[in-house]
């Protein structure tokens, strides 16, 4: 899973495929200054995320899949706000999971084995499915940015970019319980302020 030129090209390719599937808004809401994010987090996020925000802006697909943005004030969709909220929630669940020794009871693919940003290699949230407990994170590692999808305490790791993941969700190429709410009616994008 190469983070170099191949990763960037694939991100662009899947963004173009996504635009064919779900047309982008004429006037996306947001800002193109990715340096704001680096200054605040101290890390560079995947380029396809900023390409997505440039084309689509802040908003959601249908009434379901939301993509957080650092460039809007809406607290429910603001990227920085969601980092704090989801970090606190995730870490609380992780401590409960460890305290009750639930990893010995539940199968692999359940629980909270990851650290959360700002820990090195910690999860960074980028989106969710509205109202159903499904969240999407990046997991940075030495070989690339993986996607970790969580539905309550069950998770799955996908080795693909964010735009590839979203495209595959809407193309029904990903089998994950938390995505069962996605339907053809969600093949539209609504901008948010």
Q: Where do the model's predicted regions map?
A:
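A surface-exposed partner-binding patch
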Residues: 2-131, 193
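Glycine-centered tight beta-turn/hairpin loop motif at sheet-sheet or coil-to-beta transitions
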Residues: 130-133, 153-155
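Short, surface-exposed beta-strand/loop micro-motifs that present aromatic residues
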Residues: 133-139
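Short polybasic amphipathic segments
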Residues: 143-150
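Compact, glycine/acidic-enriched structural inserts
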Residues: 151, 155-178
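Charged phosphate-binding loop/patch that engages nucleotide di/tri-phosphates or the phosphate backbone
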Residues: 178-179, 187
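Charge-dense, low-complexity intrinsically disordered regions
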Residues: 187-193
């Amino acid at each position: 899973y190469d983070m170099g030129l191949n990763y960037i090209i694939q991100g662009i390719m899947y963004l173009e495929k996504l635009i064919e599937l779900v047309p982008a808004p004429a006037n996306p809401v947001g800002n193109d200054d990715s340096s704001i994010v680096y200054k605040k987090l101290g890390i560079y996020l995947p380029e396809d995320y900023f390409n997505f925000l440039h084309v689509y802006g802040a908003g959601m697909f249908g009434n379901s899949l939301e993509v957080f943005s650092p460039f809007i004030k809406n607290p429910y969709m603001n990227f920085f706000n969601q980092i704090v909220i989801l970090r606190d929630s995730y870490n609380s669940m992780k401590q409960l999971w460890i305290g009750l020794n639930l990893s010995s009871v539940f199968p692999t693919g359940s629980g909270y084995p990851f650290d959360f940003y700002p820990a090195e290699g910690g999860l960074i949230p980028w989106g969710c499915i509205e109202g159903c407990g499904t969240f999407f994170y990046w997991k940075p590692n030495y070989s690339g940015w993986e996607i970790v999808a969580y539905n309550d305490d069950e998770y799955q790791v996908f080795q693909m970019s964010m735009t590839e993941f979203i495209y595959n969700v809407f193309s029904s190429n990903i089998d994950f319980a938390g995505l069962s709410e996605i339907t053809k009616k969600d093949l539209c994008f609504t901008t948010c302020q």
